[in-house]
């Protein structure tokens, strides 16, 4: 394993750097990156951005909005938020096992006198309060796992910048965003800064991987990262995309995540459909959207079409029947 030192605080640039390491540095079997963003909302690959953020608030407070490559939900970052990325060519060995990659974080906190545990489908918690969410993405047999650690994030901003749907709050059985999360610094017996904590995470990674050395980005690497930053990750089209035309909207939440569908139906035939949500999956849901064009807008017809493919590649831990019900009642 090698680690990349990244001192940038630009959210779109940091996503571009991470994406470059993931998609282009394929000769490196394993890579590790720690990074910190200025105030930003990072939305999941499949989310409808405008429904996840309070845009008036983010605009007024200069909070950058960026879309990442992995699924899952939207998260708020600031300069007291620590993000980590692990990239591996061993995609098949730990597919969707978030727990394995969270162990260095849990071990670091144990050294600092804090007991953390892995819960739910992708959370790390201290005494039932979430401090880290994780997500994964896959590309040509390569896997990227990343997490955001709430170290000393401004909770008042977090609660105002993000929209949290009523169905998600109810499914968690709690009243608000702030009730569900904690800052690591508030749990530490002895306080430290986010940069000191970052150093401790890197030290722990070196214990887990004694042969780990630094990968220094070349001028060519940096030029290509800058190009993807300008052409993809810092663009309006990537972050917001086009608002879907639709005649039928459905929103369904399962334990494995939420699916929102916007279907344009004419004469009972699906002309187009857009699928959003905080679910996880290896495949690109545009495959599903294209598959359903021309299918009668009836549950049995949609289900039959979906059964021609392996839907778990796109919607992890969901049945084909559940996916069909998210599209048509």
Model regions: which residues?
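Flexible, glycine/charged-enriched surface loops at secondary-structure junctions
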Residues: 113-121, 209-222, 299-303, 314-317
């Amino acid at each position: 394993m090698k680690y990349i030192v990244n001192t940038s605080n630009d959210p779109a640039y940091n996503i571009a750097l991470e994406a470059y390491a993931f998609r282009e540095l394929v000769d490196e079997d394993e890579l590790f990156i720690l990074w910190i963003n200025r105030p930003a909302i990072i939305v999941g690959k499949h989310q409808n951005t405008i429904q996840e953020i309070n845009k008036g608030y983010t605009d007024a407070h200069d909070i950058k909005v960026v879309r990442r490559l992995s699924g899952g939900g939207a998260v708020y970052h600031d300069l007291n938020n620590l993000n980590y990325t692990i990239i591996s060519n061993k995609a098949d060995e730990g597919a969707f096992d978030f727990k394995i990659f969270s162990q260095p974080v849990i071990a670091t906190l144990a050294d600092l006198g804090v007991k953390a545990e892995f819960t739910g489908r992708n959370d790390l918690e201290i005494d039932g309060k979430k401090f880290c969410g994780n997500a994964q993405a896959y590309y040509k047999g390569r896997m990227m796992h990343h997490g955001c650690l709430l170290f000393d994030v401004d909770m008042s901003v977090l609660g105002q910048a993000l929209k949290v749907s009523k169905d998600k709050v109810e499914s968690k059985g709690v009243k608000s965003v702030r009730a569900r999360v904690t800052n690591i610094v508030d749990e530490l017996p002895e306080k430290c800064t986010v940069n000191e904590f970052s150093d401790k995470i890197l030290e722990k990674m070196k214990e887990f991987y004694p042969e780990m050395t630094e990968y220094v980005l070349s001028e060519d690497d940096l030029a290509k990262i800058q190009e993807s930053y300008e052409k993809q990750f810092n663009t309006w089209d990537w972050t917001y995309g086009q608002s879907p035309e639709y005649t039928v909207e459905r929103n369904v939440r399962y334990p494995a995540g939420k699916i929102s569908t916007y279907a344009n139906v004419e004469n009972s035939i699906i002309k187009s459909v857009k699928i959003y949500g905080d679910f996880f999956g290896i495949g690109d849901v545009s495959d599903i959207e294209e598959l359903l064009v021309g299918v009668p807008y009836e549950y049995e017809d949609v289900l039959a079409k979906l059964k021609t493919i392996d839907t778990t590649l796109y919607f992890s831990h969901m049945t084909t029947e559940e996916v069909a019900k998210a599209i048509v009642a």
